[in-house]
Curated annotation (Swiss-Prot):
The keyword Isomerase does not apply. The lineage of its organism: Bacteria, Pseudomonadati, Pseudomonadota, Gammaproteobacteria, Aeromonadales. One of its GO terms (cellular component) is cytoplasm. GO terms for molecular function: metalloendopeptidase activity; RNA endonuclease activity; zinc ion binding. This is Endoribonuclease YbeY. HAMAP family: Endoribonucl_YbeY. It is an enzyme of class 3 (hydrolase). It comes from Aeromonas salmonicida (strain A449). SUPFAM superfamilies: Metalloproteases ('zincins'), catalytic domain. Its cofactor is Zn(2+).
Amino acid sequence: MSVTLDLQLACADTDGLPGEAQLQGWLDGTILGFQEEAEVTVRIVDEAESRELNLTYRGKDKPTNVLSFPFEAPPGMELPLLGDLVICRQVVEQEATEQNKPLEAHWAHMVVHGSLHLLGYDHIEDDEAEEMEQLERDIMQELGFADPYLNDEE
């Protein structure tokens, strides 16, 4: 059982980013509960790249915390490629500050949240959102973090 991490640092300032071992642990803690083998690219970017991707793929002209790009293998081809996560450093840092959350916990939450999207979970419909948020809470707790939605409900 393994998750292979391809880490890409595409931001100007890499000081204070989660380390490869941290990212690997968060991916393992999320994905290995669903499948035995996977390959995931985590690309940490600045606001300009996040904004461009968010506009291109979601029609939103602003940077966002995490974008998930699931890999869809051609029919009949089985590959362990799960997909790509693109995480915007500045947005994650700003949200952690605004939400009074430890930065490490918010980084972990973005990896968990994005990984669940790669696994096919979504939060468009209320019932899907409840299921996904509960999975996030459970996984974050297993990883040693507080409920990521606690501050959102106050």
